Amino acid sequence: MAFKSIFSLFSSDLAIDLGTANTLVYAKGRGIVVSEPSIVAINRVTNAVEAVGRDAKDMLGRTPGNIVAIRPMKDGVIANFEVTEKMLQHFIRQAHNGKTWVRPRVVIGIPSEITQVERRAVEDSLYRAKASEVYMVEEAMAAAIGAGLPITEPHGNMVVDVGGGTTDIAVISLSSIVCSRVVRVAGNEMDEAIIQYIKRKYNLLIGERTAEAIKIELGSAYPLDEPLSFEVRGRNLIEGIPKTITITDEEVREALADSVSTIINAVRVALERTPPELSADIVERGIVLTGGGALLKNLDKRLSIETGLPVSLADDPLASVVLGTGKMLSDFNLLKRVKWENTITSGMF
């Protein structure tokens, strides 16, 4: 109880959604204070950080030879420990308006099925980034809380969190994840599918930023009411010169077909593993979509058709995970109920 009262006094406490595509930071009492791409630009010669977040993303595919733009997260886990540490230091400092002496307590969301080694890598990165204590919760649980689902009740709630690196699916009841499924197919995989499709069909090479723009403008999981098209500029692989083509929503849907099918099949697997009583609840309550990938046009409609269940989009799908972890900053009992005690919290750097 004493710890609970102490925890509530710290205004420097932070909640973090450390995503493959984007990192969001929620500061207690202030709301979301950082929402930036998970990208760092590093000078190869000096190893110095040139830019982080949005500024670094603007450099993707446009950097000189001595600067490289790095995504330190891959498939929901840390791929580059050193760069992740630098990125977290930057975002934590940004959340505290440049103050370097603050050592916040941090609640962070992690994919449901990552290994102990991967969990430890996240924890170590945060301690090295000057966190005083680290508490981990599954991203699907955090997303459900952020979406306003009644996770403490004895009823089944199903959430599908489509992020940048992973799609995290969970059925939740009584503050616990009853069954879950994680597939390493999400927004970034869709971008890569678009790059490969255009390369294969048009002999045109495009970059990550262009692929993401195509996905946002034209991407869909089910036919649209009105056809859409988009001008794409890239480099012709045969002639080696810049070229412009026009691509349609139907073509992009074809490019994304495998990724969408993988997500839908994972949802089916999770439903098959769900106990009958909780399945009955899901029939009534439906499935809630969260995460940036959930914004893919008509994904909710396609999933509803494929499963026969009602599917809805969270009010703020991009921020659901960080809003959920943010709620735990003010409610230690909630943090305790979602099994934070299973997380290693010792060690400090």
Segments from the language model and where they lie:
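Nucleotide/phosphate-binding catalytic cleft detector across ATP-hydrolyzing
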Residues: 1-162, 170-287, 294-349
